[in-house]
Regions:
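Fold-level recognition of mixed alpha/beta catalytic cores in primary-metabolism enzymes, strongest
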Residues: 1-89
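A structural signal for short, well-ordered beta-strand segments
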Residues: 3, 59-61, 109, 128-132
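Hydrophobic/aromatic beta-strand patches that form the interior of the parallel beta-sheet core
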Residues: 4, 35, 158, 215-219
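Short beta-strand/turn micro-motifs at beta-sheet edges
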Residues: 46-51, 115-121
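Short, flexible turn/loop "capping" segments at secondary-structure junctions
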Residues: 63, 120-126
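Acidic-enriched catalytic cores of C-N bond-cleaving enzymes acting on peptides and small amides
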Residues: 70-113, 121, 136-162
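A short beta-alpha structural unit
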Residues: 107-115, 131, 135, 161-181, ...
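Zn-dependent metallopeptidase/amidohydrolase metal-coordination segment
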Residues: 185-226
Length: 226
């Protein structure tokens, strides 16, 4: 039995579980099963086991226009207008309706920023950030292709340029329940008197690294206050 404690689980999470997994892969260590101690229970201990997670991709988009004076709009090209069209378009996309094991994929716009301190100046740049939580009907690469097609189409029509940077926190994954999963489920029920639901809801976790070397599930404390 091995026990791993990490202090680098949030954000980029580069110096914790990820490096341990890389080390174990190089050493060709075999792990039979892993339990990740995430706060999986919504309200009471014993309610939920996580057997998979949605993927997460963040996009930082910049639309590049031409700065100018608002009194002479024909001499400028307002990137704000283009950004609004792009954000409206990607927000309206219905990525899917969910699956048997996953809720529907969802895009949220998290930041909109225009660095313009003058009220009478058309800005040269417009910035926005968005995040998609996606199920296993998609990969980060398939979503990038879909989004980039939209960015190119709208920007080209507006005669603007754009830059996009993506950060992928993890791909969607599902651990098919096996006898170990059901053994843990039965044990939890015996102790808590609650049969835990097998779920894939919530954010990303270090299970996204562990699942590359071993089947895993997540079970831990109550996460009601998160």
């Amino acid at each position: 039995i091995s026990f791993l404690i990490t202090g680098d689980e949030e954000g980029y999470a580069t110096n914790g579980t990820k490096k341990v997994v890389d080390y174990l892969k190089k050493k060709k260590e075999k792990i039979n099963f892993c339990i990740v101690g995430e706060p999986t229970n919504p309200n009471k201990l014993g309610e939920m086991i996580k057997i998979g997670r949605r993927g997460s991709i963040t996009g930082k988009l910049t639309v590049i226009g031409t700065q100018g004076h608002v009194a002479y709009p024909k001499r400028a090209n307002n990137p704000s207008d283009v950004m609004v069209k792009i954000l409206k378009k990607i927000k309206e996309i219905k990525l899917d309706r969910g699956t048997k094991n996953f809720q529907a994929s969802n895009l949220e716009i998290t930041k909109i920023n225009i660095d313009n301190y003058a009220d009478n100046v058309i800005p040269g740049f417009a910035h926005a950030t968005f995040n998609i939580r996606f199920n296993n009907k998609h990969s980060s690469n398939s979503l990038k292709r879909k989004l980039n097609t939209i960015f190119k189409s709208i920007s080209k029509k507006a005669r603007c340029k754009f830059n996009i940077n993506y950060q992928v926190s993890g791909e969607a994954f599902l651990t098919k329940p096996n006898k170990t999963t059901y053994m843990v489920q039965d044990t939890i029920k015996k102790i808590t008197k609650i049969k835990p639901k097998l779920s894939t809801t919530g954010g990303t976790s270090d299970a996204r690294f562990i699942r590359k070397i071993a089947p895993c599930l997540e079970f831990g404390l109550v996460g009601k206050s998160m």
